[in-house]
Regions:
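Catalytic core of pol beta-like nucleotidyltransferases
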Residues: 1-28, 36-42, 53-102
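A structural signal for short, well-ordered beta-strand segments
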Residues: 31, 48-50
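A short, structured beta-strand/loop element
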Residues: 42-48
């Protein structure tokens, strides 16, 4: 199910749940992509860039579980990308669009 979101609503929701999300090892979480740019379509997912505490030892299972939890909180599909991103072009887009939640 896709729900139309504004950047302000996404960031406010993430900030409301910041303590819970930080317990998963998140150091910072930023919105980027179409929602951040205000170009949301009815089928837009929510693109998030995450920096993790190295002590959290994130693996694919933990990352997937966190992505699902954030999608549940936001009521929309989420694409959660750990930073730094290897593809320079994608990292440039993240940096250009970035709206920091925390």
């Amino acid at each position: 199910m896709f729900v139309m979101h504004t950047a302000e609503l996404v960031i406010a929701t993430l900030r409301t749940h910041e303590a819970e999300l930080r317990q998963s090892g998140l150091r910072s979480l930023s919105l980027f992509g179409s929602v951040a740019r205000g170009e949301t379509e009815t089928d837009s997912d929510i693109d998030l860039a995450a920096e993790f505490d190295p002590a959290a030892r994130m693996d694919l299972l933990k990352l997937t579980a966190l992505e699902r939890r954030i999608a549940e909180l936001l009521g929309s599909p989420v694409d959660l990308l750990p930073e730094p991103v290897e593809k320079r072009r994608l990292q440039d887009q993240i940096n250009r669009d970035r709206l920091r939640a925390f």
